[in-house]
Design a protein with these regions (language model features):
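Conserved long alpha-helical elements within nucleotide-processing catalytic cores of c-di-GMP signaling
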Residues: 1-2, 9-36, 44-48, 52-53, ...
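Short catalytic/binding micro-motifs of nucleotide second-messenger systems
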Residues: 36-40, 65-80
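N-terminal hydrophobic or amphipathic segments with adjacent small-residue motifs
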Residues: 13, 17, 41-42, 76-78, ...
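Short beta-strand-to-loop capping motifs
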Residues: 53-58, 87-89
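Catalytic-core segments of nucleotide cyclases and related cyclic-nucleotide turnover enzymes
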Residues: 64-71, 86-120
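PAS-family sensory domains
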Residues: 82-84
Length: 122
């Protein structure tokens, strides 16, 4: 069982600058981008700007090969999504895989903001 934890970058700025209606549109666009990028998985919105993509029946090596081809941040049309992933042999360990994915995603999100904030101030 492979799990990707995805979080939209910049939603707070969008909401603060343009309002929540524009922020909602950004969430919809991000969901479509994730569906297109990970069509082999099942996409779930777990709240706010966070999503999980679940890959059932995929062995560890295939999942890792699949993820090695992906970036830790998806960027398209001014949408930036930070990603983390985890894998487990059985669904009983799903929480562990989800936690691994979430921790990796937060690390990548912090990395994104360090780089993004540096570019802004230059």
């Amino acid at each position: 069982l492979g799990i990707i934890f995805a979080d939209l970058n910049g939603l707070k700025d969008m909401n603060d600058t343009f309002g929540h209606a524009k922020g909602d549109q950004l969430i919809i666009r991000a969901a479509r981008l994730l569906q297109e990028s990970f069509e082999d998985g099942l996409l779930y919105r777990i709240g706010g700007d966070e999503f999980i993509i679940v890959f059932e029946g995929m062995d560890q090596f295939r999942f890792r090969d699949y993820m090695d081809k992906e970036s830790h941040i998806i960027e398209k049309d001014s949408i930036f999504v930070s990603l983390g992933w985890g894998w487990t042999k059985n669904s009983a360990s799903r929480e562990r895989a989800q936690l691994d994915a979430e921790q990796m995603m937060y690390h990548k999100k912090a990395e994104y903001y360090r780089t993004h904030d540096r570019r802004r101030s230059s």
